């Protein structure tokens, strides 16, 4: 039996089928638990729960949620096309006319209008624009000339700039195919572009520094945002582009940087952050994966940034009547 956990979702090639989700009330966003599937995070910061899984029936092996949380991209072992899952109520799943041989990483631009998918079998990066309504394959990046294992991807909203993080280097690639090594970064622990921008935040775990890179595919100008930040696991920016956030998997610390002034404040989490996945709000992020335990979130929209947990999901059970 395959080691991949398959989630049952209903799907028929060429059609999209709605499914009843029963979602009501405020939604902070969505998450994907391999054991249960795609689930809404219900409520508000500090008072949230994980809702019932969306019921969509087909076998899928990978799901990645868009940063705007309105849709997801998925890979199905029984289908060669990229799948689009719409997370509205009712939810639905449909194929995109974009074939993919074997998926690795899937990364979204800040607004979720573009995505980059690592096609491992063909050793390429597929750049998809026009998401979610008019998805088209905008570019393919051949990875055969690069050494090292690809570990992270970031791209901007116009699909004109892509950052690729390998095990031993980081490179910037323009829409024209121009390749520019980011020589001051040895290994990216996390990287993201600003919204509607060619500027990016990159955390270098080899030097424990966090950089702001202006115009990454042109005459790049770099400035140090943090000079000593160990084991950065993820970076993110607020939707208004005013603040950057960096999370450490070693200390559980999340640094908040005002990009205009460079001032830094910190929040702590009794967890080991592995992501900064944006949720609804200007600066609300998920810090950890579910994996059957509590999920930790960061509320950067409160007067002072704070972390809080969402209790683990407990499936509803129906008691058998006593005979």
Write out the residue ranges for each language-model feature.
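A short beta-strand motif characteristic of beta-propeller blades
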Residues: 48-55, 92-98, 136-144, 177-184, ...
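Sec-dependent N-terminal signal peptides
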Residues: 5-13
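Structural motif
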Residues: 37-40, 79-85, 122-128, 168-173, ...
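Conserved beta-strand positions in repeat-built beta-propeller and related beta-rich domains
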Residues: 31-34, 66-67, 74-78, 109-110, ...
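An edge-strand/N-cap motif at the start of beta-rich repeat modules
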Residues: 19-47
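Short loop/turn segments that connect beta-strands within beta-propeller blades
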Residues: 44-46, 86-90, 129-133, 174-178, ...
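Repeated scaffold domains used in trafficking and secretory/extracellular systems
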Residues: 19-20, 59-69, 100-112, 145-155, ...
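Solenoidal tandem-repeat scaffolds enriched in leucines and small polar residues
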Residues: 132-211
């Amino acid at each position: 039996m395959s080691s991949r956990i398959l989630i049952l979702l209903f799907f028929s090639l060429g059609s999209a089928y709605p499914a009843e989700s029963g979602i009501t009330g405020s939604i902070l966003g969505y998450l994907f638990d391999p054991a249960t599937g795609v689930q809404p995070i219900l409520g508000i910061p500090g008072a949230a729960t994980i809702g019932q899984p969306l019921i969509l029936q087909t076998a899928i092996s990978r799901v990645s949620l868009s940063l705007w949380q309105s849709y997801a991209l998925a890979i199905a072992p029984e289908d060669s096309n990229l799948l689009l899952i719409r997370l509205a109520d009712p939810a639905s799943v449909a194929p995109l006319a974009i074939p993919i041989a074997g998926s690795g990483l899937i990364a979204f631009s800040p607004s979720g209008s573009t995505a980059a998918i690592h096609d491992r079998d063909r050793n390429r990066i597929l750049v998809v624009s026009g998401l979610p309504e008019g998805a088209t394959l905008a570019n393919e990046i051949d990875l055969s000339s690069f050494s090292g294992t690809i570990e992270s991807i970031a791209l901007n909203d116009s699909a004109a700039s892509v950052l690729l993080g390998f095990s031993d280097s980081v490179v910037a690639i323009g829409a024209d195919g121009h390749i520019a090594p980011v020589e001051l970064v040895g290994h990216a622990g996390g990287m993201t572009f600003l919204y509607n921008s060619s500027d990016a935040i990159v955390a270098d775990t080899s030097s424990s520094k966090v950089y702001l890179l202006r115009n990454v595919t042109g005459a790049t100008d770099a400035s140090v945002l943090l000079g000593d930040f160990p084991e950065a696991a993820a970076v993110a920016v607020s939707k208004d582009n005013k603040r950057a956030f960096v999370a450490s998997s070693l200390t559980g610390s999340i640094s908040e940087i005002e990009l205009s002034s460079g001032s830094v404040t910190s929040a702590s989490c009794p967890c080991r952050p592995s992501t900064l996945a944006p949720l609804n709000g200007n600066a609300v992020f998920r810090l950890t994966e579910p994996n059957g335990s509590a999920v930790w979130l960061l509320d950067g929209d409160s007067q002072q940034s704070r972390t809080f947990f969402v209790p683990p999901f407990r499936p509803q059970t129906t008691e058998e009547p006593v005979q």
